[in-house]
């Protein structure tokens, strides 16, 4: 190893030391670790107690289960990897020990990237499934749970293929100090892919809004033609699931949109704005918005489901009732007495 290589090695170790012990960076690492630890049981309970018992069609239910399962795995990965960032600096014997081994970084970074992008691409399946459900209103309740799994495997396959395209030439030979930082050589194609996913999420959100408007008009017109209870229930189910997935998509769009805009902003203004490469690297290494989403979405989801359940119960109580007065009330009374005596005579 020549003198220049030794100097570069020492500079990398010094950089890792100054960034790791920077107050803002340490607080951000600790925040991500704590939030992810809290998100693990919260997401698990939400998935088991709220998502799995939902009376939705199997296709949309499968999509929701896979989405929140991916969020759960993502939170576990964040908690595990950021525990390394929080704990390792307390026991190092050399500044160079702060540099993550390339093999460990490769596994950790690619795993985080995969599940973060799965969270972004999965809501597209919500919209596709909802549009198909609306187009097959009369018969969708009898459709088997096939579309949901098909969409999940297709979207994950697309995500894997695009990520392979982004990282196919990456050697992972740099010095890495954070699992959340994308290698410089892959940063441009990764940011491009991230922008494409963000545009897709925005388009998906707009499509969801249009879908709800179309559904409300379609529902009113369709109920005049078809008054069967099963069709009424299916139309209401489509409305409820669409509103819930819209809330999930919008919440994710807020957090991921902010993360992406902040990341691009930091890269655009460069290190001169931050007064040096250390502060610039710290700004790039702060990774708190997406982990915070994993915890926030639990409370948003619980609130949304509770509100929709309460509204549905109020609608049932106000609209589904047996009149007890007037001519219709008299007929209902006579029918009830007749049904009672018919039952008694049979027994």
Curated annotation (Swiss-Prot):
Pfam family name, one: 7TM_GPCR_Srb
Any Gene Ontology CC annotation: membrane
Entry keyword set: Membrane, Transmembrane, Transmembrane helix
Bilayer topology term: Multi-pass membrane protein
Subcellular location: Membrane
Main location: membrane
A GO term, aspect molecular function: transmembrane signaling receptor activity
Transmembrane segments: 27-47, 62-82, 108-128, 146-166, 194-214, 246-266, 288-308
A biological-process GO annotation: sensory perception of chemical stimulus
Family statement drawn from the similarity comment of this UniProt entry: Belongs to the nematode receptor-like protein srb family.
Name under which the protein is recorded: Serpentine receptor class beta-2
